[in-house]
Amino acid sequence: SYAGSTTSTANYNTGLGYIALNANTGGYNTAAGALAGYRNASGQYNTSLGFSALEGVASNNHSYNTAIGGRSNELVTTGGYNITLGYQSGDNITSGDGNIIIGSVNADSATDDAQLKITSYDGTTTVNWIAGDSSGNIIHAGTTHSAGGQLTTTGKALVMGF
């Protein structure tokens, strides 16, 4: 399978699938699936499950990512602490950190940090259930909430508190 076939100095890695973790010199990585973690040169503590999950582009160094799903977080180069779940979830993230993407959808930005996106997809239509950004703004099914500031809503809303 060539999994980890050119890895020479890495410790505690597990690669399963065609050229999974092929050139990695970092440690504590787990990759299952063809091309999973393939171009991760020295990153560590990554978990990738699915075809091309956390594959990366060129030689790169990404650490502390969890990608589950085919092509999940596929283009990462230096981004870390990302969680992506679903087919092609967050596959556009290159250097963003601390993003959580659930569902078959891209992050709003390939380089921003602390993005949140929870979606559903039926093969033709994507519905964003919850989205958030590093400023604390949260969008919940068409309603915008701002943490630590003024609450703004669209549509019918009941607001209680001071």
Which positions does each model-derived feature cover?
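Glycine- and small/polar-enriched repetitive beta-structure motifs of secreted/surface proteins
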Residues: 1-162
